[in-house]
From Swiss-Prot:
This is tRNA selenocysteine 1-associated protein 1. InterPro entries: Nucleotide-bd_a/b_plait_sf, RBD_domain_sf, RRM_dom, SECp43_RRM2, TSAP1, TSAP1_C. Residues 3-86, 96-175 form the RRM domain. The keyword Nucleus applies. Involved in the early steps of selenocysteine biosynthesis and tRNA(Sec) charging to the later steps resulting in the cotranslational incorporation of selenocysteine into selenoproteins. Stabilizes the SECISBP2, EEFSEC and tRNA(Sec) complex. May be involved in the methylation of tRNA(Sec). Enhances efficiency of selenoproteins synthesis. GO terms for molecular function: tRNA binding. Component of the tRNA(Sec) complex composed at least of EEFSEC, SECISBP2, SEPHS1, SEPSECS, TRNAU1AP and tRNA(Sec). Associates with mRNP and/or polysomes. Found in a complex with tRNA(Sec). Interacts with SEPSECS.
Length: 287
């Protein structure tokens, strides 16, 4: 039975032939591509549905090429794929996530997924977080549909080797209460990994990750895992993922503060209070 994947972040010039060729370049054969367009303007909506021969082929393709560079794309883009719920009820089954830290730059989504799914069949997917240039930030997330397998993975794979060049560091990700807000149709299919708030502030310092250079130091104590294993996240699209320990841009912060201060001053000067002509001027009576 045929199965489809949702593909997003498309440019207007990316038509059915372009998408089919891109998958063929990656060694995947698609049955058809359906570009979704605005009903009123006819302009492409920025996403499509790609049909495969069966569910197994679609799943293999998702985990193999999701997040990899999109051949022929200008400007450079990456495959942004997800399971399609086109014409179906969305899957509301619970998910249990793990934060995976200390990933080396060679680890991609497919490698992260394969590392866990071969032992834990309920692993639904893996996501390595990238910066704006497409370089790994050194951490990612994996999702499970079985809570027991999530807990087993946390215990059994803590410090495990075989994923990249360093032992992996794991912690539990607990979802906060979801905010109810309207979303556009295309956003329903976004590959929704989550924004995580680190409960420990010195993650990169202890594990030897340099945020400025994206490089790793191997001088940290082996298995010195003293932080809390609990981390929380709030569900947002994967494009909104943030660095767990961002650096403060002092110059930009000062500039923003001064602009806000000037706006407040101008607002006060423009209100109904008028300056006195001279020091000896009388204060007008209240109307």
């Amino acid at each position: 039975m045929a199965a489809s994947l949702w593909m997003g972040d498309l440019e207007p010039y990316m038509d059915e032939n372009f998408i089919s060729r891109a998958f063929a370049t990656m060694g995947e054969t698609v049955m058809s591509v359906k570009i979704i367009r605005n009903r009123l303007t006819g302009i492409p909506a920025g996403y499509c549905f790609v049909e495969f021969a069966d569910l197994a082929t679609a799943e293999k393709c998702l985990h193999k090429i999701n997040g990899k560079p999109l051949p022929g794309a200008t400007p450079a883009k990456r495959f942004k794929l997800n399971y399609a719920t086109y014409g179906k009820q969305p899957d509301n089954s619970p998910e249990y996530s793990l934060f995976v830290g200390d990933l080396t730059p060679d680890v991609d989504d497919g490698m992260l997924y394969e590392f866990f799914v071969k032992v834990y069949p309920s692993c639904r997917g893996g996501k390595v977080v990238l910066d704006q240039t497409g370089v790994s930030k050194g951490y990612g997330f994996v999702k499970f549909t079985d809570e027991l397998e999530q807990k087993r993975a946390l215990t059994e794979c803590q410090g495990a080797v075989g994923l990249g060049c360093k032992p992996v560091r794991l912690s539990v990700a607990i979802p906060k209460a979801s905010r109810v807000k309207p979303v556009e149709y295309s956003q329903m299919y976004s590959y929704s990994y989550n924004q995580y708030y680190q409960q420990y502030q010195n993650y990169y310092a202890q594990w030897g990750y340099d945020q400025n250079t994206g490089s790793y130091s191997y001088s940290y104590p082996q298995y010195g895992y003293t932080q809390s294993t609990m981390q929380t996240y709030e569900e947002v699209g994967d494009d909104a993922l943030e660095d767990p320990a961002p650096q403060l841009d002092v110059t930009e912060a000062n500039k923003e503060f001064m602009e806000q201060s000037e706006e407040l001053y101008d607002a006060l000067m423009d209100c109904h209070w008028q300056p006195l002509d001279t020091v000896s001027s009388e204060i007008p009576a209240m109307m």
